[in-house]
Amino acid sequence: MVRVDVEERFNRIARNTVEIVTEEELKGLLASGARIKGYIGYEPSGVAHIGWLVWMYKVKDLVEAGVDFSVLEATWHAYINDKLGGDMDLIRAAARIVRRVMEAAGVPVERVRFVDAEELASDKDYWGLVIRVAKRASLARVRRALTIMGRRAEEAEVDASKLIYPLMQVSDIFYMDLDIALGGMDQRKAHMLARDVAEKLGRKKPVAIHTPIISSLQGPGRMEASQGEIDDVLAEVKMSKSKPETAVFVVDSDDDIRRKIRKAYCPAKQVQGNPVLEIARYILFARDGFTLRVDRPAKYGGPVEYTSYEELERDYTDGRLHPLDLKNAVAESLIEVVRPIRGAVLGDPAMKRALEAIEGKVTR
């Protein structure tokens, strides 16, 4: 019975992830019967797009798997990263909106601990930990980790505070005494740094769980010509709050969603880098019991329903499903996902005012 329970919990956590470092360590945690503490940190930096739903759904999975989960509202991190013009009031307002989005997206927020980075930064012991982490990380390693901010290593030349950011992220994990660190693949370097430094400090190594990054609606561009590392490439091709046409936002209207998906990069028979298929896989089919209905005229094959992503991908790669039919089906299903979230945010006058103030200040 215990083994079955561990497998069920592991499978729930592992689904729709890119990697777990390491799977054996995670299974060991689940089998131990001990309290497991996990977290994700995010920058409250603007209006959430649907790519954020990927990690929000994974938070739900972890909570339902019995993990004691915290969400770090990385306000000071956002300030260092020049988000929202460095206006801490706007940054905190953005955090309040994200909480509402999580709740409307079905995350059991009553079982999640929300932590403002101010809580950490106000403790002198936290800064002592940052210094100890810095003593055990080379400057070159820290510079390479700047991609976790959506920045390139050379951008540290402009503002030295950028170098503190990776050290803070590693220290967050140690300060909160975490067993699991969740993040997108763009956070991998910080998590690997944390695992390396943990050994040097005699601390437990966090299990790193990495979720996929939803590609820009505009496609990969010159990704195939890039000589950068995977983190750099991901930063270039993912949905971005500062580039509205690359993303669907959780407050977009039905018509905007249809328009954006209709224009999205979606080459026939191609899976890699296809944002429409990624939305289907990581957002739509991530929900239990979801069925994608494709309505099309009889002369093009007639209506068809897909109860699994694997069925959808097979028909698409075989050419039995046209890109336009895929787009139309995904758009209509995505509208159903976004509609209650949009209503929860825009239906609250205070949230709506905060959103309007934030929208004009979104920065790279």
Swiss-Prot record:
Its EC number is 6.1.1.1. It catalyses: tRNA(Tyr) + L-tyrosine + ATP = L-tyrosyl-tRNA(Tyr) + AMP + diphosphate + H(+). ATP binds at residues 49, 52, 241. Disulfide bonds: none annotated. One of its GO terms (molecular function) is tyrosine-tRNA ligase activity. Signal peptide: none annotated. L-tyrosine binds at residues 39, 165, 169, 172, 187. The keyword Transferase does not apply. The keyword Heme does not apply. It is found in: Cytoplasm. It holds the Pfam family tRNA-synt_1b. HAMAP family: Tyr_tRNA_synth_type4. Homodimer. Catalyzes the attachment of tyrosine to tRNA(Tyr) in a two-step reaction: tyrosine is first activated by ATP to form Tyr-AMP and then transferred to the acceptor end of tRNA(Tyr). This is Tyrosine--tRNA ligase.
